[in-house]
């Protein structure tokens, strides 16, 4: 039996999962941490805390492994590291961190985002690494001239363990656009970016400071002696384990829900929420509010991403007694449209609706029935409403979804948020029994796939990054998820009609915000492009 380790740096928790080559969980560990808000609207974490958290999560996993009477972990067969995508982590040629880590949550790069989107003819959201980099170029950041290496949080942790400057294709696509045909950074856009930076006297070329992009199934490096001691300071862990290319939380969500093929959509709902649909063909036009990212094997996906999901709910649950399950189930007693109660959960800016700053609030429309059930239902609705607004923008593309799977903390109470999501999307939604393991488990599966592919290549049967005779899709379907159980909920007519009415009220409140905060010139939401269903569900 192999031992495969997956580690994921989430927004509020660092998780570690140990499983075998078929994805069966052997042990788990975790560590809680929080971001800090610095001056200038910058959200950040200390890298020292990331290392401490990784060590603590692994130590807890070791204790869990021993508790299950499986002994000590002397060696691992494969490891995978994942984390929050995007952000800004620059280093000089000596590996010295040049500036504070700027996370995906920062909405301080609007000028760079707009300029690059126009120059590339491709949406560059504010949270993307290249937007952060170019904003620092525009601002004349002192560190810019000394940058020798730019990476993500997962890329940084992977580098500490292996000494390799690499990323998986999906994680790389959150730094700089990736060409699905070449499975590498887009060559034309690289040249365009270099030309823009040359005007500002930047001494480097963008490709030279980006990590190398690798496909799922390729080897991302091996655990060094130094890396083994860093991960397990007790000295019990041997070096030598194979590491998969580090991936983003979006991609590990795809893998954890077995949604990696065309027409399949994964919804991940935790601190943030995103719905990611794998595209059969490129979108016909550019949508500034929609990310185009890539799967671990390079296929394009359209993503509607909202910065805030469960954080606002967490605050209210704490105030109302702390019993998540009871409050979530109480929401089922609320009116399908929440009876005029509306919550806005924005604890940070939300680019989809063109809001740059945080403004959580509760609103009651005239005649509203302000009950706890309606309030909780409104809070859960609002956690997915912004994502739905984004999906509505691409309604004209005629996306056909063959399946929708969901995972994340929002769905821990069975059949509550899952039903609301089905009503919101107008499509059946499945929660797999395995999806509760989360992104760390998804990353472990990618590591297992990399080890499997490497083994087949050694036997002379391989075909490179596509998995040596088994694609990632085949591996997941035939090895990991074969016979997997899940619960599927179909849209409820009353619920779907109620959510549609709630979304109208939600947008009505958003449009009133500029006058509330004294910024009448501010335009939230933009043109009224909302349609009832953002995607078509193919039931054939």
Predicted stretch roles:
Residues 106:
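Carbohydrate-associated surface elements
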Residues 168-171, 203-215:
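Conserved alpha/beta enzyme-core scaffolds, especially Rossmann-like or related mixed alpha/beta domains
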């Amino acid at each position: 039996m192999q031992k495969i380790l997956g580690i994921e740096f989430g927004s509020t928790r660092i998780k570690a999962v140990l499983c075998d080559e078929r994805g069966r969980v052997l042990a788990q560990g975790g560590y809680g941490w929080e971001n800090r808000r610095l001056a200038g609207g910058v959200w950040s974490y200390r890298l020292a805390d990331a290392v401490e958290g990784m060590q603590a999560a692994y130590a807890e996993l070791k204790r869990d492994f021993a508790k299950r009477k499986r002994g000590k972990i002397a060696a691992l067969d494969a490891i995978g590291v994942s984390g929050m995508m995007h952000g800004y982590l620059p280093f000089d040629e000596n590996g010295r961190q040049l500036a504070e880590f700027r996370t995906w949550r920062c909405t301080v790069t609007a000028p760079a985002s707009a300029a690059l989107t126009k120059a590339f003819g491709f949406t560059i959201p504010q949270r993307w690494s290249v937007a952060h980099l170019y904003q620092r170029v525009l601002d004349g950041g002192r560190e810019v001239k000394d940058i020798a290496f730019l990476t993500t949080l997962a890329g940084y942790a992977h580098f500490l363990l292996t000494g390799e400057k690499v990323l998986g294709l999906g994680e790389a696509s959150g730094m700089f656009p990736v060409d699905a045909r070449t499975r590498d950074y887009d060559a034309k856009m690289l040249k365009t970016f270099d030309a823009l930076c040359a005007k500002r006297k930047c001494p480097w070329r963008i490709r030279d400071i980006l990590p190398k992009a690798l496909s799922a199934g390729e080897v991302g490096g091996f655990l060094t002696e130094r890396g083994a001691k860093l991960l397990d300071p007790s000295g019990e862990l041997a070096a030598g384990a194979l590491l998969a290319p580090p991936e983003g939380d979006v991609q590990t969500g795809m893998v954890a829900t077995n949604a990696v093929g065309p027409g399949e959509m994964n919804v991940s709902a935790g601190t943030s929420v995103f719905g990611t649909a794998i595209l059969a063909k490129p979108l016909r036009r550019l949508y500034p509010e929609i990310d185009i990212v890539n799967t671990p094997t390079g296929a394009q996906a359209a993503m509607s991403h909202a910065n805030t999901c469960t954080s606002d709910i967490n605050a209210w649950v704490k105030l109302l007694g702390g019993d998540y399950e009871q409050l979530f189930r109480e929401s089922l007693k609320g009116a399908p449209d929440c009876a005029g109660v509306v919550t806005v959960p924005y604890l940070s800016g939300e680019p989809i609706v063109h809001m740059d700053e945080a403004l959580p609030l509760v609103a009651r429309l005239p005649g509203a029935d302000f009950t706890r059930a309606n309030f909780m239902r409104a809070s859960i609705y609002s956690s997915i409403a912004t994502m739905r607004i984004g999906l509505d923008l691409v309604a004209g593309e005629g996306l056909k979804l063959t399946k929708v799977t969901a995972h994340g903390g929002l769905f821990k109470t069975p059949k509550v948020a899952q039903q609301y999501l089905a009503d919101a999307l107008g499509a059946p939604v499945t929660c797999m029994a395995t999806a509760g393991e989360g992104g760390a488990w998804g990353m472990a599966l990618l590591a297992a796939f990399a080890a499997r592919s490497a083994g087949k290549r050694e036997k002379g049967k391989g075909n490179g990054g596509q998995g040596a005779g088994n694609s990632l899709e085949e591996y997941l379907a035939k090895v990991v998820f074969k016979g997997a159980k899940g619960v599927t909920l179909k849209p409820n007519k009353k619920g779907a009609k109620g959510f549609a009415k709630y979304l109208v009220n939600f947008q009505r409140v958003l449009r009133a915000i500029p006058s509330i905060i004294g910024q009448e010139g501010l335009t939230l939401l933009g043109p009224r492009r909302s349609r009832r269903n953002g995607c078509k569900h193919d039931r054939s």
